[in-house]
């Protein structure tokens, strides 16, 4: 068997590879999150966020990397793999990591509002699940945080410069709150 390219304990190195993927997302004006999946000291999958490009809310870096890794190993089980991601996984991505039986998740910057690896909740080690992932947090945290902060500062500047009409209204697509009225017994919902 080939010797691993890099020592398995090199979280710093593999997070650097995830940061390279995040930089690709940044350049594409996607939220700059990158992920790599490592097995036996080798990167078997790499991905960056592609939500805007693919017009797919599930096209997070972690989801894309897990799918690639499963194809690379020829199995949906990733029991001997580590997922490296620049930002704490959301509930969807954490759930996918648990279902794929990823052994360990390593992330850069935490997300106290929506993170599911200990930030807002911890799906990776949820007590009632029979599968859990080991967690390593804070690897190259400052670099991961810095890229996200720069990205969102630039996005706010672009929106501000373009004026209030540029953002297409509320992101929910719902009418303004003053246009809502309660449903009555005779109202029907659009199908």
Question: Where are these predicted regions, by residue range?
Answer:
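A cytosolic small-molecule/anion-sensing beta-strand core signal
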Residues: 39-40, 67
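Helix-adjacent hinge/juxtasegments
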Residues: 66-100, 104
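Zinc-dependent deaminase
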Residues: 1-25, 89-92, 96-191
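A short, polar/charged loop-to-alpha-helix boundary motif
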Residues: 53-63
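Short, basic and Ser/Thr-rich N-terminal targeting/leader segments
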Residues: 29-33, 77-79
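Short beta-strand scaffold segments in enzyme catalytic cores
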Residues: 33-39
């Amino acid at each position: 068997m080939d010797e691993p390219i890099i020592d398995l304990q090199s979280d710093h190195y593999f997070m650097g590879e995830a940061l390279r993927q995040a930089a690709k997302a940044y350049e594409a004006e996607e939220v700059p999150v990158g992920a790599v999946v490592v097995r036996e000291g080798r990167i078997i999958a790499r991905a960056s966020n592609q939500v805007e490009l693919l017009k797919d809310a599930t096209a997070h870096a972690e989801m894309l990397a897990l799918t690639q890794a499963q194809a690379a190993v020829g199995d949906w089980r990733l029991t001997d793999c580590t997922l490296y991601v620049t930002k704490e996984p959301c509930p969807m991505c954490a759930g996918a990591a648990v279902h794929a039986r990823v052994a360990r998740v390593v992330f850069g910057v935490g997300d106290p509002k929506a993170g599911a690896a200990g930030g807002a909740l911890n799906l990776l080690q949820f007590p009632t699940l029979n599968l859990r992932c080991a967690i390593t947090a804070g690897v190259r945290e400052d670099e991961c945080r810095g890229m996200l902060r720069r990205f969102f500062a630039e996005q706010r500047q672009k929106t501000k410069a373009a004026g209030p009409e540029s953002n297409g209204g509320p992101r929910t697509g719902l009418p303004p709150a003053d246009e809502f009225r309660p449903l009555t017994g005779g109202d029907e919902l659009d199908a």
